[in-house]
A protein has these predicted regions:
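Juxtamembrane helix-loop boundary signature in multi-pass membrane transporters
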Residues: 1-8, 103-160
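Hydrophobic/aromatic residues within transmembrane alpha-helices
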Residues: 23, 32, 85, 111-113, ...
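Residues that define the loop-to-transmembrane-helix transition and helix capping
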Residues: 30-31, 92, 118-120, 179-180, ...
Length: 249
C-alpha cells in the first residue's frame, strides 16, 4: 500500500512544480511560499480533524516532537531555496537538481536506518545522477540571464534540505499518525516562512499580488498538501531509500 502512496506523492509533487512556477512569475518567491504554506496548513489540519487523529497529539513524545520540528525547519529551508531557484532559473534545470536529493537520501538512509545496499540501488543511484546531469544540460535557458548562476546554488541547497527533511521526517513520524505528523511539521514551516517575509520586510507585497498568480499559488498549496500526506504515509510504512526515489519521479 505504501507504494501507491509514494506514487501519489510523486504525481502531486509534479503538479506542484508547474503550478508554483506559474505563480511566481511576478510574485516574490518568499511571499508565495508563505501564502501557499497557509493553504497546506489548513489542508493538513482539516484532514487530521476528519480522520479523528487529533487526539494523538497528547501522546507525542519529546523525541518525536523534536524531529518533527527539525523536519519542518528543513522543509522550510528547502522550500525557500527551491522557489528562489525557480524564480531565477529554468524549471527544466531546477527540478532535476532538486530531485537529485534522492541520492543523498539513499545514502543517509543507509547510514541511519541500515536499510541495506544492493546492486540495484547502486545502479539506480548512478542512473539518477547521470539523468540529472543530462537534464540540466539538455536545454539552454532562454528566459534568464545565463551569467546568473544563483539559481544553481539555491537548487543545490534545496536538494540538501529536502534530503534532511526525509530523514528527519522518517524518525519523527515513527510513533504517531502520519497525517498528524504532517500537520505539526507544516505548522513549523508556516512560522519559518512568514518570519522570512517579515524579516525581509516583504509583507507589503502581498497586496499587489496578481489575482491569476494568487490562484496558481493556492492551487500549488493544495497539490503540496496532497503530496505531503501521501509521502509521509508511504514513509511511515516503507523504506526511505525506496519511497524517496519513487516520490522524486
Amino acid at each position: 500500500m505504501w507504494i501507491i502512496y509514494a506514487i501519489g506523492s510523486a504525481f502531486f509533487a509534479g503538479i506542484t512544480s508547474i503550478l508554483a512556477k506559474c505563480g511566481i512569475s511576478k510574485t516574490d518567491s518568499d511571499v508565495a511560499t508563505a501564502i501557499r504554506t497557509v493553504v497546506v496548513l489548513v489542508f493538513s489540519w482539516i484532514l487530521v480533524l476528519l480522520t479523528g487523529t487529533i487526539s494523538g497529539i497528547t501522546d507525542i513524545g519529546g523525541k518525536t516532537l523534536l524531529f518533527l520540528v527539525l523536519s519542518g525547519i528543513a522543509t522550510g529551508a528547502s522550500w525557500l531555496c527551491y522557489f528562489k531557484a525557480l524564480q531565477n532559473g529554468n524549471v527544466n534545470k531546477v527540478v532535476p537538481i532538486d530531485k537529485s536529493s534522492t541520492i543523498l537520501t539513499i545514502l543517509l538512509a543507509l547510514i541511519f536506518f541500515h536499510e541495506g545496499l544492493s546492486l540495484a540501488k547502486i545502479g539506480c543511484v548512478c542512473m539518477i545522477g547521470l539523468g540529472t546531469m543530462l537534464m540540466i544540460n539538455r536545454k539552454e535557458d532562454v528566459k534568464s540571464n545565463t551569467s546568473d548562476k544563483s539559481w544553481l546554488i539555491y537548487a543545490i541547497l534545496s536538494a540538501v534540505f529536502a534530503s534532511l527533511t526525509s530523514i528527519l521526517g522518517k524518525i519523527g513520524i515513527s510513533g504517531i499518525d502520519s497525517n498528524l505528523g504532517t500537520a505539526i511539521r507544516t505548522s513549523v514551516v508556516l512560522v519559518m516562512a512568514w518570519l522570512m517575509v517579515f524579516v525581509k520586510n516583504k509583507q507589503s507585497e502581498i497586496k499587489s499580488i496578481d489575482i491569476k498568480e494568487l490562484l496558481f499559488i493556492i492551487l500549488s498549496g493544495f497539490a503540496t498538501g496532497a503530496s505531503w500526506i501521501c509521502f509521509y504515509r508511504a514513509l511511515q510504512d516503507g523504506p526511505a531509500s525506496v519511497v524517496v526515489p519513487i516520490d522524486k519521479l
